Curated annotation (Swiss-Prot):
InterPro entries: FAM13
Phosphoserine sites (modified residues): S130, S258, S405, S406
Source organism of the structure: Mus musculus
Phosphoprotein recorded as keyword: yes
Keyword Phosphoprotein part of the UniProt annotation: yes
Similarity field: Belongs to the FAM13 family.
Low complexity bias locations: 200-217, 282-294
Name of the protein this chain belongs to: Protein FAM13C
Region feature Disordered, mapped onto this chain: 82-134, 192-238, 268-304, 327-352, 366-485
Comp. bias intervals (Basic and acidic residues): 98-111, 327-342, 415-446
Keywords for this protein: Phosphoprotein
Comp. bias intervals (Acidic residues): 462-471
Length: 601
């Protein structure tokens, strides 16, 4: 056996052929298996003529023969290094150290021994066999080995061997760390499974040594799959360990919450709706459920919401009232709207009050629609029916003795008949539809009511116009004579035919013509007279406006605000006369423009 090994080291051509054969075998793993096996058979016939006899002689060695061979070896650095490589599991690092020392002597052995030891380590051959038999065994196993996994390819290079060793060591450390972390969360059965999965690759390599050389293909896949299995199991354990760890931390469907989040744990504030939109957890789980829970329980708690809104509105009113009282005590007058809005706090109260009233109105309407009864409907109808009653009574008092007021009676009678035909409905939508239907009648009735009171008030206006010193009575003059003067001719005829009060107008006009021209008979004046009145009226307006402006400026200096209606009492006469002059000026301008148009036509 020793002579065979020495022969393998001395024969350079044989060693180089063996090295090239192993290199070709390792590189040609990705090539076609049939071509490689054919080439190997031809090379074996040429280079190893006596391999079969030697394999038969040294097929089954014993442990004692192995020890005898180790004792009879001569003390040689190269041979001892080679035998150490045959025995060890990691020959590449030892060979690298020896090659650094004896680079010139053992350059050839550096190629031969790793390839042989690699083939021997992969095939599981014993260390006492001859190098020729081990080379042949390596060739046979490579030839018959199936391509199961590309990761199990035999790499004879030293650099990649050390990298693979480091990678295996790091994987073993990671597996040990994962098993330590998962031991707190996994059961004893899972722990046993992980320990077996981690420790299985090492015994697999030791137990894969074949007893017979006739069937070398069986142990090789087992040993060859061991690194791949170790890598796969490490990846599986890493993914499974992390997933199980996360599963135990989150506790499945019931995640563990922080103690500071005890308010939200297992409560209805937690949003578990799968149909909800994907949003950040801060807004989805805590902010959104508050509004959703409020909306969900709004049907039963609507009266409470209405009461809360009512209390809020009352508190805002109370605050505003206190501000008004305090303001009045300090400045001796009630605050105006501008005074309230100038204060930002009061402005906020007023805005909140408007919003609260609007929300309260919407809530009441919604509640009435849900309950099927609208308390606002009949109230509105009553409010619409009650105001016309005194007006109709007033009309009957003023226009009661009229025998021929058929147009007004028909228009006033249509509205009550329509109200009787459309009783107050329970649904709020129905009342809106009815109001839209009756709206033209309301508009017509409103226009008639605005026209009817004017004829009865005309005589009193004419009497007051003669005495211009009466300011309180003259305050009604600016608004009343304008519509009368602007009425069409047909309306004047209707009033003269239907109202007996109009019979007094000619006598009053005759009495009014005697002193001077007044508001009632300006339309009878000529163009020069109208122009003179226009100049005089404009001069009076300027004079009064100057006096009133001085009063307002003085008041503003004293109080810092413009005078209100109650502040104008000292200058009530001037204000009344100023309004009267403005109305007279408008009338004169209209009359002059009418006469100019008539002349042009």
């Amino acid at each position: 056996m020793f002579s065979c090994f020495c022969f393998s080291l001395q024969d350079n051509s044989f060693g180089s052929a063996a090295v090239t054969e192993c290199d070709e075998d390792t590189v040609s793993v990705h090539e076609d298996e049939d071509d490689c096996s054919g080439l190997r058979d031809e090379d074996n016939k040429e280079n190893y003529p006596q391999v079969a006899a030697r394999l038969d002689e040294l097929a089954l060695p014993s442990h004692e023969a192995q020890q005898h061979v180790e004792q009879t070896l001569p003390v040689d650095g190269v041979l001892r290094t080679s035998m150490g490589n045959f025995k060890s599991r990691k020959p590449k690092s030892i060979l690298r150290a020896e090659s650094g020392r004896n680079h010139g002597e053992s350059q050839e052995t550096e190629h031969v021994v790793p390839s042989q030891s690699e083939c021997q380590g992969r095939a599981g051959t014993p260390a006492h066999e001859s190098p020729q038999s081990s080379i042949f065994r390596c060739q046979e196993t490579v030839r018959l080995q199936p391509r199961i996994d590309q990761r199990a390819t035999i790499w004879p290079k030293d650099a990649f061997g050390t990298q693979q060793d480091l990678h295996e060591n790091s994987l073993l450390k990671l597996q040990a760390l994962e098993s330590g972390l998962c031991s707190a969360f996994l059961t004893t059965q899972e722990e046993d499974g992980q320990v077996h999965g981690v420790k299985d690759p090492a015994p697999a390599s030791t137990q894969s040594a074949p007893a017979d050389s006739a069937d070398p293909a069986d142990p090789m896949p087992a040993h060859k799959d061991a690194p791949g299995d170790a890598d796969g199991t490490s990846e599986d354990l890493q993914s499974a360990g992390t997933s199980r760890l996360l599963y135990h931390i989150t506790d499945g469907d019931n995640p563990l919450l922080s103690p500071r989040c005890s308010i939200f744990s297992q409560s209805q504030r937690f949003n578990l709706d799968p149909e909800s939109a994907p949003s950040p957890p801060s807004s989805q789980q805590f902010m959104m459920p508050r509004s959703s829970s409020r909306c969900g329980s709004g049907d039963g708690k609507e009266p409470q919401t209405i009461t809360q809104l009512t209390k809020h509105i009352q508190s805002l009113k109370r605050k505003i009232r206190k501000f008004e009282e305090k303001f009045e005590q300090e400045k001796k007058y009630r605050p105006s709207h501008g005074d309230k809005t100038s204060n930002p706090e009061v402005l906020k109260w007023m805005n909140d009050l408007a919003k609260g009233r609007k929300q309260l109105k919407e809530l009441k309407l919604k509640l009435s629609e849900e309950q099927g009864s609208t308390p606002k409907g009949p109230r509105r109808n009553l409010s619409c029916e009650q105001p016309p009653v005194p007006r109709e009574n007033g009309k009957s008092e003023a226009v009661g003795p009229e025998p021929g007021s058929s147009g007004e009676e028909t228009s006033d009678a249509v509205v009550p008949e329509k109200r009787e035909q459309t009783p107050p409905q329970d649904d709020g939508k129905g009342t809106k539809q009815d109001k839209n239907l009756i709206k033209p009648l309301y508009d017509r009735c409103r226009g008639i009511k605005q026209i009817l009171p004017t004829p009865s008030l005309i005589p009193t206006i004419q009497e007051e116009e003669d005495s211009d010193e009466d300011c309180p009575q003259g305050s009604q003059q600016p608004s009343l004579p304008d519509p009368v003067s602007r009425l069409p001719v047909g309306d004047h005829l209707i009033y003269s035919e239907t109202e007996p009060v109009r019979t007094l107008l000619p006598d009053e006009k005759k009495e009014g013509k005697q002193p001077a021209l007044s508001m009632s008979n300006l339309h009878e004046a000529t163009m020069p007279v109208l122009l003179d009145h226009l100049r005089e009226t404009r001069a009076d307006k300027k004079r009064l406006r100057k006096a009133l402006r001085e009063f307002e400026e003085q008041f503003f200096k004293q109080t810092g605000r413009s005078p209100q209606k109650e502040d104008r009492m000292p200058m009530a006469d001037e204000y009344c006369e100023y309004k009267h002059i403005k109305a007279k000026l408008r009338l004169l301008e209209v009359l002059i423009s009418k006469q100019d148009v008539a002349k042009t036509i």
